[in-house]
Amino acid sequence: MKFLFDYFPIICFFVAYKFWGIYIATAAAMVVSALQVAIYWIRFRRFEKFHVITLIFILLLGSFTLVFHNAIFIKWKPTIVYWIFAIVLFGSHFFGKHTLVHRMLKEKIELPAKTWSRLNLSWALFFLILGVLNLFVVYNFDTNTWVNFKLFGTLVLMLVFILGQAFYIARHAQNLKMNSR
C-alpha cells in the first residue's frame, strides 16, 4: 500500500498527461504531491523525507515548466532528485557511524558492516544511473516516450533492483546466521 502511495503523484502525472498534456500533468503532479505530504503528516504526524524532497523539486521545476511553458524543467526533476539521493547515500559513508541504508534497515536486518557498505554504494550508484538514464530518454526521445519511461521504465528498473538487493541481503544474512552458530 505504501508503494502505491509513494507512486501516486507519478500515476496522476501519467493519467493527466495522457488526457490533457504535459502542462496539466505538471500542475496535477504539483497538487497531488502537496496532498501526499499533507496526508502523510495528518496520518503519522511526521514528514517522509522522500516526499518532501520530491515536493520541493516538483513545485520549483513544475512552476518553471508552467511559467516558461517549457517541459524541459519537469523532465529534469527525476534526475535532480535521483542525484540528490545518490549524493546523500554516498556521503553517508563519510558522516556518522553507519551508512544511510544501515541506519534505515538495521532494526529489521542484521548484516556485516562490509555488506551494509556495499548495499549503500549500490543504491547510490543505482540512483546515479537512473538520473543519467532519465536524461538520455529526455534528450533522445519524445515527451510521450519520456512519460512512459518515467512511470513504467523506472518502476520496472526499481523492482528489478530491489529484487536483486533482496537476494544479496538474503545471501549475506544467511551467511551471518550460519557463522554465528
Swiss-Prot record:
HAMAP family: YciB. It comes from Coxiella burnetii (strain CbuG_Q212). Signal peptide: none annotated. Belongs to the YciB family. The chain crosses the membrane at residues 8-28, 53-73, 76-96, 121-141, 149-169. One of its GO terms (cellular component) is plasma membrane. Disulfide bonds: none annotated. This is Inner membrane-spanning protein YciB. Plays a role in cell envelope biogenesis, maintenance of cell envelope integrity and membrane homeostasis. It is a multi-pass membrane protein. It holds the Pfam family IspA.
